[in-house]
């Protein structure tokens, strides 16, 4: 199946684009949704997180205490690597299981840290970045989450620089503060139609999709 890696910084609007692609028939696998399920009450990652970080990492309902973890990572940057070492193998396993069951027109992996991980270039046929300026990111995240600007900037600092993401992109969807919902939809539709054509070509004899042996 033809594979798209969809990414973008926090607040860029990648989830909104992913929802549109799903509406039009793509199979969408969201790494963030998998991560949240793994760290929800009873989530598969929670026993290992509790062992690694202690009971203070677990909220009263049994989920990951995200505010506590954000504070820890700010004070001890190495804690991010410890958490990712627990989560990433599980996310990878669940991602592959979902991909094996996908039956859409093509497959979209929504991965916030796609560029940062360095593991996705060979797993997807194209990388698409949903892009906006930092001020727009901050405004959107403040509106939806109530996080302070310093907290948001810390999250942004842990992600790839905007220029780095754009350099890795095969396709870019601009979703800045001036982009209307209709314009965003039109931009996403243009790429959807392009990917459908590429998926069709890859499925023909002699066509090749990511992960296919030479």
From Swiss-Prot:
Pathway where it operates: Cofactor biosynthesis; coenzyme A biosynthesis; CoA from (R)-pantothenate: step 5/5
Any Pfam family: CoaE
GO cellular component, one term: cytoplasm
Enzymatic reactions: 3'-dephospho-CoA + ATP = ADP + CoA + H(+)
Primary residence: cytoplasm
Intrachain disulfide bonds: none
Binding locations of ATP: 11-16
Domain named DPCK: residues: 3-202
Membrane spanning stretches: none
Annotated keywords: ATP-binding, Coenzyme A biosynthesis, Cytoplasm, Kinase, Nucleotide-binding, Transferase
EC number: 2.7.1.24
Subcellular location: Cytoplasm
GO biological process, one term: coenzyme A biosynthetic process
Keyword Nucleotide-binding annotated: yes
Summary of the function given for this chain in its UniProt record: Catalyzes the phosphorylation of the 3'-hydroxyl group of dephosphocoenzyme A to form coenzyme A.
NCBIfam families: dephospho-CoA kinase
Record-stated family: Belongs to the CoaE family.
Name of the protein described by the UniProt record: Dephospho-CoA kinase
